């Protein structure tokens, strides 16, 4: 029996990152809504409890509280952001609105006299104070500590950035240790889970495979499953996992919606039908998709249309299978959280994903999403454990709506053809260019990255078609053609991301090739936006 950590979700966009960090410590955990019953908390028998953040305010939403059993069990509790504030309010402290809200990078003075932060710091001030580089996102602040608590951390604008009652094992921080921007966040969470709570680090991906296979078999029984295969990492791993569970009860449907990458159709069929010996049906629905997208410019409308058409194609194919009752998808957690689909339903919707937002209530198939609670890096780890080839598992992710969300505004076949070729050039150059010692010396990569391709050093890279024209000069003549943007990011979980600092020589070569080889494009720009505030995809 694994030790378990209970994460209570108050509606934060990054709650699942807490689970990701706990799993990285090889400790089993589950996320549940903050309003579960006291009986549920007791029956769960957690080794520790973590309270998530929230976009809500403790003094405006008096119902958003942790169950009383959290405080009665006698197990260690860690509050994060809103979790700290509700801990303060529920245990006799005070929270007030702050006239100096903090969103983004901050430096926190760590008061290292507690077990949680002892010897954990990023640097020390000339006065000898330990400092942490963290990520803040709060508008309220704790102004009075609950009885029995002492100060854990502080900033000039947030005097109580952390607090602790070590006698009861209660700790709380105003910043977010779960996001990668908080440099010592993983160390802090591991300290809490492994040392303070004493949880055993015995949960590994092999356990998840066994549990997922068992769950799929129990859920599906002897019914058939149809899966929409895109060739991307998520749907590929989902297909392999489901195939391991139920074999030929799975039929993969590969839909060519006219918005795929260059030569993707051939690659998908060769890989899945040829190498994996799975049942794959190839459907050319490009005319259907492009026809419905004609004249549509709103990003949400485009995503909804693409999702709707996917469902219609799947339903049509399912009717050809005598026992098809399930529609499987490679939905992963970032898709769910950006669609406001967290377990509490309290997270704010950022944008709809076709996997989770395009399914009508009248869908005649039940939904099977075996990767729904996993992050991209976990999905890759799962794929390797399932025996999938490296080139499949570590291929950059591709959105379900395809180039439809990489063409700003109206989607046209002409635009898709231009974008396909520009994107292929970008990816080809990334694959063919290796990081050098000079790149490392310039801070573009680490010393251990020298010799790796820039494709492997970026988490996701692609081109975006901009429906605007720019004046250029080719030979002795004037041109007036479209603009394309290049986007490359580095991330571990796709919930937050940094733009990739690619070498200028590489970017210059990509730009030169696109302008010279893709007639219809006259200018190339590079996107230097992080996530947040921008999302990785432009639409």
Curated annotation (Swiss-Prot):
The protein's annotated pathway: Purine metabolism; GMP biosynthesis; GMP from XMP (L-Gln route): step 1/1
Recorded GO CC terms: cytosol
Gene3D superfamilies cross-referenced by the UniProt entry: 3.30.300.10, 3.40.50.880, HUPs (3.40.50.620)
Entries under InterPro entries matching the protein: Class_I_gatase-like, GATASE, GMP_synth_C, GMP_synth_GATase, GMP_synthase, GMPS_ATP_PPase_dom, NAD/GMP_synthase, Rossmann-like_a/b/a_fold
Enzyme class (EC, first level): ligase
EC number: 6.3.5.2
Active site (record annotation): 81 (nucleophile), 176, 178
A Pfam family: GMP_synt_C
Binding site for ATP: 230-236
Glutamine amidotransferase type-1 domain boundaries: 4-202
Every GMPS ATP-PPase domain range: 203-395
Domain of life per record: Bacteria
Keywords carried by this UniProt record: ATP-binding, Glutamine amidotransferase, GMP biosynthesis, Ligase, Nucleotide-binding, Purine biosynthesis
Chemical reaction(s) catalysed: XMP + L-glutamine + ATP + H2O = GMP + L-glutamate + AMP + diphosphate + 2 H(+)
GO molecular function: ATP binding; GMP synthase activity
Subunit-level organization: Homodimer.
Function: Catalyzes the synthesis of GMP from XMP.
Protein name in UniProt: GMP synthase [glutamine-hydrolyzing]
Organism name: Ralstonia pickettii (strain 12J)
Classification of source organism: Bacteria, Pseudomonadati, Pseudomonadota, Betaproteobacteria, Burkholderiales
